Curated annotation (Swiss-Prot):
Subunit structure: Heterotrimer of A, B and C subunits.
One family name in Pfam for this protein: GatC
Broad class of enzyme this protein falls into: ligase
Name of this protein: Aspartyl/glutamyl-tRNA(Asn/Gln) amidotransferase subunit C
Function: Allows the formation of correctly charged Asn-tRNA(Asn) or Gln-tRNA(Gln) through the transamidation of misacylated Asp-tRNA(Asn) or Glu-tRNA(Gln) in organisms which lack either or both of asparaginyl-tRNA or glutaminyl-tRNA synthetases. The reaction takes place in the presence of glutamine and ATP through an activated phospho-Asp-tRNA(Asn) or phospho-Glu-tRNA(Gln).
UniProt keyword list: ATP-binding, Ligase, Nucleotide-binding, Protein biosynthesis
Enzyme Commission number(s) from the entry: 6.3.5.-
Length: 95
């Protein structure tokens, strides 16, 4: 499927892109080459090939989900300018 100039103008309008007349031929050629590559990829027979999320069988070594820091909320709120019921009070910024 090849794009025409009017197709690229419509796509540019929908995408809110301001293309001038000098850019349209270059953009049209670039989009047509991208669509040509997509056509090549779609032509490949992939029956029997399992989809991959990653080309290698890799797994992440995750650390155990353990609490490593103590709760210091009281110490942090002691130095805060204003708190109430465990919450930080800040000036109103939106009316």
């Amino acid at each position: 499927m090849a794009l025409e100039r009017c197709d690229v103008e419509k796509i540019a309008h929908l995408a809110r892109l301001g293309l001038n007349d000098g850019e349209l031929p270059r953009i049209t050629d670039a989009l047509n080459s991208i669509l040509g590559l997509v056509d090549q990829m779609q032509a490949v027979d992939t029956t029997g090939i399992e989809p991959l999320a990653h080309p290698l069988e890799a797994s992440q070594r995750l650390r155990p989900d353990q609490v490593t820091e103590s709760n210091q909320r009281d110490a942090y709120q002691a130095i805060a300018p204003s708190t109430e019921s465990g919450l930080y009070l800040v000036p109103k910024v939106i009316e």
